[in-house]
């Protein structure tokens, strides 16, 4: 058929990385030219791979039997939401405490025991994959009895990390400084920042 280019199908590899990079490249090549678009797309794909393929896919595959056991195959949707929220918002960015997550999902009709069991499972699996989480949880094996107190302690002692932290944590142990944007050279020291502000005020 005209316009379908069906004869070309054999030339194009149809795996995820090719499709993903191809779509992104098509978008960015118009903005920044071939060389930079190529670099950007490679970079984006490697981030996608590190986070989603290496972390989320592995977690989902490991937890699937547990979810089906807890909810039956047809009712796993809210539990998948719980798993993803636990990975990102609780363990990686410390935006939510474990007790908050329990309250939230109990209100949505998930039994507290199920929520705690899953939270503990997520923590135990993440420990194997993400060095920083292993470092935070330590040698404790999480279960439904200790997960809330242990995780609440971790979250409240280092609360509300910036979203970019999730990517940092995926690959390294806990950095010594919280990776908020450090500022430009002149503004990263408090003295020069205040001095600059005073100069501005004088000029007003």
From Swiss-Prot:
Which terms does the record give in the GO molecular function aspect?
DNA binding
Q: Which UniProt keywords apply?
A: DNA-binding, Virion
Mention any one GO cellular component term assigned to this protein in its UniProt record.
helical viral capsid
> Domain of life, per the record?
Viruses
Q: Where in the cell?
A: Virion
Q: Quote the record's domain comment.
A: The N-terminus projects into a DNA groove.
Q: What does this protein do?
A: Self-assembles to form a helical, filamentous nucleocapsid mesuring 1980 nm in length and 24 nm in width. Together with capsid protein 2, wraps arounds the DNA and maintains it in an A-form. Capsid proteins probably maintain the DNA in A-form by non-specific desolvation and specific coordination of the DNA phosphate groups by positively charged residues. This certainly protects the viral DNA under conditions such as the extreme desiccation of its host.
**What is the annotated quaternary arrangement, including any partners?**
Heterodimer composed of major capsid protein 1 and major capsid protein 2.
> What protein am I looking at?
Major capsid protein 1
Q: Gene behind this chain? A: SIFV0036
